[in-house]
Each structure stands twice: as C-alpha cells, then as structure tokens.
Design a protein with these regions (language model features):
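N-terminal lobe/hinge region of extracytoplasmic solute-binding protein
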Residues: 1-55, 265, 270
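Solvent-exposed coil/turn segments that connect beta secondary-structure elements
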Residues: 3-6, 14, 35-36, 54, ...
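Short, solvent-exposed loop/turn and secondary-structure capping segments
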Residues: 10-13, 74, 95-96, 229-234
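Second-shell loop/turn segments in exported
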Residues: 12-14, 63-75, 205-207, 258-260, ...
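Extracytoplasmic/secreted proteins, especially bacterial periplasmic and envelope-associated proteins
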Residues: 21-25, 40, 44, 76, ...
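Envelope-exposed proteins and targeting segments
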Residues: 26, 45, 56-60, 64, ...
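Gly/Pro-rich hinge or "lid" segments in bacterial periplasmic/extracellular proteins
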Residues: 34-36, 153, 160-207, 213-216, ...
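Aromatic- and charge-enriched surface segment that lines or borders ligand/interaction sites
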Residues: 48-180, 218
Length: 272
C-alpha cells in the first residue's frame, strides 16, 4: 500500500515512486510489464509493435486497439499519444521527465527551445562551413555571464524588443569568434522575425511521432533502439486525455483541475 498522500496524479508532473504506483493503476501505456518476467512486454493499448527495419530499429510502429477508450467512454486514439508527447515536451510545463522522450526525433531541441538551431538548420543559405561552427555553439542561457547581459538570457530566449536592440548594437551579445559576422546578423534577423510572429516552435520541428491513422502510432528515433518497447513502459510515455486536459486549462498549464476526483479520465484498470 501507499504510506502517504500522493503529491499529484498528473503523469507529466509527478516524479515520485508513490505517485507512479497510483498512475500505473489509473493509466495504461503502449505496452505493459510482465508480472514475473523482466524484459518481457505485454500488450497494452498497443496489440502489436515492430521496427520498420529489423536490422536498423530506428523507426517503430505500434498498432493500437480499435476498441481502446477512456473511462468516460471517449475513444482513445493515436492522437492522444501525440498530444501527451507534445505536452510532456512543452517547456512551460517544466516536467522533470521530459528527457525520457529525447529518443524521438526533434524532441530535445523543441523541449530546450533551441530556436536558432530550428530556424536555421534547413536554410539553404546556411553553408556547411557555417554549420561546422554553429553546431558547437549553445545559444541558450549562460548562468556564468553577467545577469544584465544578453548572454545570461541566451539568444534563443531574447524577446523581439531585445533582438531589435541587438540588431542596432551587435556588441550587446558576445559571440564565439568562430561565428562570422554575416552568420550572426542572419541568426539575429531570423530570431527577430520569429519572435514577432508569436508562433510556437512546434511548427518548426519535424517531430518523429506521427499518426498515419487513428489506430497507428509511428515513432522515428534519432538512432536505432531495439528496446524501445521496454522504455515505453514508463508512465511518461502513457497517453493523457486531450479532451479532459484542455477542458481545464492549456497544454502547458501545471496543476490544473483535470486530475481531481470527478475530473480525472484514465484508461487503466482503476478509476478515481
């Protein structure tokens, strides 16, 4: 049994063992754990799973139960998994376990808000020579820099107004000497245009998880991972009910009412 009250029941926010025990009773993931055999995955929401290429398992397919549903009777589809993945990676949610999804293509740069990288990587104007230097540069916050400088906040996190100031006075940001002046100006301009647009970085990424149809989930990884089904046993890979979460707040809101008794909608063997 549990020895104390849980601190919460949101699979994307809690991190304790006590909470995880309850969450596993309220929710079910793609696969389940065998009761007596380690390393053996049993069907969960997914009835079948397999790599597209057996010799290079960097892309997986999970076929979902067509009769899967939430405790309120709503259909549970691949879209609920996609919503759950995006929510876990949403920077504003500040989940402790977001890194569990870093295996998925483009999960890490989105979660870390690597704006400069995402804005520039597919730009034909960025030469291989530019990328040779840029890929080594971290445009995120620098806690060792003076708090009054743009370096402390990081280029990726500057507001439109701050980026305008940087365009006018390039010396407000200390660049690595390896980054040419032309590259610097281009990066600042791209960041400024995006900051003005008020768009979400999600629109820039080529996220590896997709849903070809309601009952199929495809996951493209950064590298081959033969034991991906085992990883999906962790509750951070569980689906969450999109309709219930958004009824009580936005995707990145913490500690909303959706996990309260009477509101929580799960897909596990128990209900709250």
């Amino acid at each position: 049994g549990n020895t104390a009250e849980p601190k919460g029941l949101d699979p994307h926010i809690v991190s304790g063992v006590l909470e995880s025990n309850i969450i596993r009773a309220l929710f079910e993931g793609l696969v389940g754990a065998h009761p007596s055999k380690d390393g053996v995955a049993l069907p969960g929401v997914a009835t079948k799973w397999y790599p597209v290429n057996q010799e290079r398992p960097d892309e997986w397919v999970f076929e979902l139960r067509k009769d899967a549903q939430w405790s309120d009777g709503a259909p549970l589809t691949a879209d609920d998994f996609l919503f759950a993945f995006r929510r876990l990676l949403t920077p504003d949610l500040a989940s402790d376990y977001s890194f569990m999804l870093y295996y998925i293509r483009d999960a890490e740069p989105y979660h870390k808000s690597q704006r400069s990288y995402l804005l520039s990587r597919k730009d034909a104007n960025f030469t291989d020579e530019w990328w040779a230097t840029l890929k080594e540069v971290d445009f995120g916050p620098n806690e060792e820099a003076d708090e009054k400088t743009f370096n402390f906040k990081g280029l990726d996190f500057l507001t439109a107004e701050e980026l305008k100031n940087l365009q006018a006075k390039p010396d407000l940001f200390t660049w690595p000497e390896s980054v040419p002046a032309e590259t610097r100006a281009t990066l600042v301009a791209k960041n400024l245009a995006f900051a003005k647009s008020d768009k979400d970085l999600w629109n820039l990424i080529d996220f590896g998880a997709t849903a070809p149809d309601k009952h199929t989930l495809k996951v493209k990884l950064n590298s081959p991972l033969p034991f991906l089904p085992e990883i999906t046993k962790h509750y951070t890979w569980y689906p969450v009910p999109k309709h219930a979460v958004l009824k009580h707040g936005k995707i990145g809101d913490r500690f909303t009412e959706w996990t309260k008794p009477g509101n929580l909608v799960g897909n596990g063997p128990f209900i709250l």
